[in-house]
Amino acid sequence: MKHIFIVNPAAGKSDRTAEYREMIDAAFAPRGLSYELLVSGAPGECRTLARQAAQSGEEVRLYACGGDGTLNEVINGVVGYDNAAVTHFPGGSGNDTIKIFDDPAAFTSIERLLDAEEARFDLIRCNDSYALNVLSIGFDARVGTDIARFKRLPLVSGKGAYILSIFSNMLHGLTADYTVTLDSGKVFSGRKTMICVCNGRWYGGGFNPVPEAEPDDGLLDVLVVEKVNLLQVATVVGHYQKGRLSLIHISEPTRP
């Protein structure tokens, strides 16, 4: 098997490429194994590098070194290639995807990633792209778009950037008109705050909107958040973060 590490030097708050190389060398040298380390130079290039590796036809394990966005790019690069497996060596600010698994700490050890068995997981398809974890639409998606600029602030964590972006976007309107149709035939239409399609459970620096979601059960868990006003936002965000929106009757988690 070929081992390829794809590094996003822009992930997190500093370039960790040299640190990654030291850790990889320490794990691979005693085993007499070789590897390649590829560094992305532009947004979207991790996907291109992953696709090129998969197209070689060799059995390959790709290690996405960066944040959740880096992992997403690498996954999108290998969809449809059975010779390629993907894992994650986290180096972002949120690193939420690994929280799907029983032992997230295992992903911080190169040795344990080398020894790990492969498993198959579901993906969310949106137009021509795929997601492993969560797909959000509406207010939350706008919040996610603005997170990057808040992450640049000193002493702001991934979760802190998410919270700041929430309150910034509150000033630009909370709702929009949507129609959501599930495979079951159930339809949600009208003014909605956001729609969250969950294959995994954690995102946004620690938000857990649907605790029941499992990435290998063949189902997507859909959470539709109804229209809320500014006075409700703080309560909604708190319940949304903890996966308790159904308790305040403004959402309906369903499985298509």
PLM region descriptions:
Residues 9, 65-67, 89-92:
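Glycine-rich beta-strand-to-loop/alpha-helix junction loops that act as flexible
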